[in-house]
């Protein structure tokens, strides 16, 4: 299968042991968020568990009444039997009420917990550095919000309550069975031993493959999303068959994992059920032997101690009848506990992945310089302003506690900058450049030369390994990242539009922009004409990343979005390399208007878009090998000249 850049591979889960520690964290979070409700739920479950046990115990009482009835007649025991039946009905009704209450409460707790968890996940994700998204595929990240959240939903709404209820019932039944007959209890212990072995071997293997199935499902979803996003590229290069082969490989892995998981899961419950049936038969047989012995083989029980003063006494039919009912109920609840293992293991894996996202270190920001609105006096003195003035300034704290204001001009300078995404593989070497306010700098070079990396450093998406970047004379590392990015505008080749109106998408560049400012930005970007021709103009709804617009129209909206922000520094990252030449003329006019009076960094594969730059930097393997104006570089007849004349190609 083809390797996909940016995706961090995950090790296969088969053979790995599940880490159940995240479940403890889930439970702690539940109690932190819903303590009162969970206490009420636990109380209801305890009552329901007790209610579930009592009928089996009442069978012993009713059977004793029936035995008395055989001697005394119906009239002698009818009152007792009717009283016992009414009591059992009341018990069942109480259990039904408690079950109804706790299921409703758990439904609220589950949805509330998932709502808060998704909020925490998304809030944390928004604070992550770009590096995280470069190293993890969108499909993997999306699976946190879908597959993993769904396993937690099943855990909280079903597995934990059922496990708690079944566990209480099992403990209660063991105590009562021990109370009624210790010899019969030995048979039950034999059953527990067998069930434990089956759970460990069959259930454990099933759990391993369920974990692997969950991982494989995430890979399948990630690959499908990747292919959907790149469908045009797949078709252009006629890679349909290759894509199918790659998909078949990961789909085959999913089939194998799911098949093994279901195979073990499907034999697990029948085995547990048959162990329960065998245990029932053995209990009935031993009980029959003890009864038929006529007291020669006495029953050892605490019930006898309380009733006769001695633990040894003949075994009664009523005790056997009650014990058989408890045995059946016991095996059913043990099976239910065992059945939850797969769900719990999958939920543990899902919780681990969710907490892995939540616990990711947020993007570090040690900056202390902020961007503020300012007013400028005739003598150039800057003062902080609470209203819009069109002037921005850097607010720089001084050692004596004062604040120095530096006008935002857009002067960007690199001094001996080195950088590497991977410490073993440097990307940039000794980059030094100067962009004065209003200048246009262009970066030219083959893919991987380091053009986009330079713009990533200006945005502080990544921090440099060595050297310095100065912005208006201020060390860029001293500027708060949000304020720094607020001063920058960016237009990318791959335009991202969001669900909402055209006006909303333009306003995304400046959330407090008025409609008039958005329309002015659209006019500046040459987008106004096509927008007014849309069905609802600026109120036209865009969905699916603006699928109802052409590539050129989407590009114009991206330019308008950058224009409304009115930043002093613009980054145009290959902004016209994916549209036709005719459309490029319209887009280029919009860009020229946008670039006017700003410091601009341009990355383009079409050299025609950078000829009017104040300086052109030719990069090769992370180094600036040529620099100068278009005319100067042509005259030097170096690499740029070779690119311009077609002797070399960028790609």
Residue ranges and their predicted role:
Residues 12-16, 51-67, 90-138, 142, ...:
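Juxtamembrane helix-loop junctions of ABC transporter transmembrane domains
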Residues 43, 98, 102, 110, ...:
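Hydrophobic alpha-helical transmembrane segments of ABC transporter permease domains
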Residues 33, 37-50, 91, 158-212, ...:
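Transmembrane helices of ABC transporter permease
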Residues 74, 374-651:
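ABC-type nucleotide-binding domain
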Residues 69-70, 176-190, 260, 264-352, ...:
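Helix-loop-helix
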Residues 38-101, 178-183, 285, 292-317:
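Transmembrane helix-loop-helix hairpins at lipid-water interfaces of multipass membrane proteins
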Residues 35, 130-131, 147-156, 160, ...:
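An intracellular "coupling" helix at the cytosolic face of ABC transporter transmembrane type-1 domains
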Residues 1-52, 67-87, 102-106, 110, ...:
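Membrane-integrated ABC transporters
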């Amino acid at each position: 299968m083809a390797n996909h850049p940016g995706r961090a591979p995950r090790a296969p889960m088969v053979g790995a042991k599940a880490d159940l520690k995240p479940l403890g964290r889930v439970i702690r979070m539940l109690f932190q968020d819903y303590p009162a409700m969970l206490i009420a739920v636990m109380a209801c479950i305890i009552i329901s568990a007790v209610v579930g046990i009592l009928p089996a115990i009442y069978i012993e009482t009713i059977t004793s009444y029936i035995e008395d009835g055989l001697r005394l007649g119906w009239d002698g025991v009818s009152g007792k039997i009717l009283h016992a039946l009414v009591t059992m009905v009341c018990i069942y009704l109480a259990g039904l009420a408690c079950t109804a209450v706790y299921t409703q409460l758990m439904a609220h707790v589950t949805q509330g917990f998932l709502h808060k968890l998704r909020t925490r996940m998304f809030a944390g994700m928004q604070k992550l550095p770009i590096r995280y998204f470069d190293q993890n595929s969108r499909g993997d990240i999306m699976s946190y919000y879908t597959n993993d959240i769904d396993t937690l939903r099943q855990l909280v709404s079903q597995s934990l309550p059922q496990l708690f209820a079944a566990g209480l019932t099992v403990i209660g039944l063991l105590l009562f069975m021990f109370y009624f007959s210790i010899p019969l209890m030995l048979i039950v212990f034999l059953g527990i031993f067998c069930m434990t072995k089956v759970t460990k071997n069959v259930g454990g293997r099933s759990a391993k493959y369920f974990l692997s199935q969950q991982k494989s499902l995430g890979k399948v979803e990630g690959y499908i999303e990747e292919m959907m996003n790149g469908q045009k590229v797949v078709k252009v290069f006629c890679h349909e068959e290759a894509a199918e082969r790659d998909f078949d490989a990961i789909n085959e892995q999913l089939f194998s994992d799911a098949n093994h998981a279901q195979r073990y899961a499907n034999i697990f419950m029948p085995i547990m059920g048959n162990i329960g049936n065998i245990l029932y038969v053995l209990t009935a047989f031993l009980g029959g032997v003890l009864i038929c012995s006529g007291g020669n083989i006495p029953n050892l029980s605490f019930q006898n101690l309380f009733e006769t003063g001695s633990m040894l006494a003949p075994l009664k039919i009523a005790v056997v009848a009650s014990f058989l009912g408890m045995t059946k109920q016991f095996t059913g609840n043990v099976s239910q506990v065992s059945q939850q293992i797969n769900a719990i293991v999958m939920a543990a894996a899902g919780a681990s992945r969710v907490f892995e996202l939540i616990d990711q270190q947020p993007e570090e920001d040690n900056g202390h310089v902020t961007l503020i609105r300012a007013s400028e006096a005739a003598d150039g003195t800057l003062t902080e302003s609470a209203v819009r003035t069109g002037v921005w300034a850097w607010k720089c704290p001084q050692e004596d506690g004062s604040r120095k204001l530096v006008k935002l001009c857009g002067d960007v300078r690199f001094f001996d900058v080195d950088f590497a995404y991977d410490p073993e593989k440097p990307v940039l070497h000794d980059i030094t450049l100067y962009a004065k306010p209003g200048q246009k700098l262009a970066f030219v070079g083959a893919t991987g030369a380091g053009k986009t990396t330079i713009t990533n450093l200006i945005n502080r998406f990544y921090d440099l390994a060595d050297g310095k970047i100065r912005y208006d004379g201020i060390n860029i590392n001293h500027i708060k990242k949000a304020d720094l990015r607020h001063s920058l505008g960016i237009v990318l080749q791959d335009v991202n539009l969001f669900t909402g109106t055209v006006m909303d998408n333009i306003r995304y560049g400046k959330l407090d922009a008025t409609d008039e400012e958005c329309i002015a930005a659209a006019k500046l970007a040459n987008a106004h004409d096509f927008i007014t021709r849309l069905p609802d103009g600026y109120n036209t709804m865009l969905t699916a990343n603006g699928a109802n617009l052409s590539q050129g129209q989407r590009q114009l909206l991206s330019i308008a979005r950058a224009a409304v922000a009115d930043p002093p520094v613009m980054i145009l990252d290959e902004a016209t390399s994916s549209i036709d030449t005719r459309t490029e003329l319209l887009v280029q006019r919009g860009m020229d208007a946008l670039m006017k009076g700003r410091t601009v960094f341009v990355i383009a594969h079409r050299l025609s878009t950078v000829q009017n730059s104040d300086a052109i930097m030719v990069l090769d393997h992370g180094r600036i090998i040529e620099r100068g104006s278009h005319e100067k570089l042509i005259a030097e007849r170096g690499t740029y000249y070779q690119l311009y004349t077609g002797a070399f190609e960028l790609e």
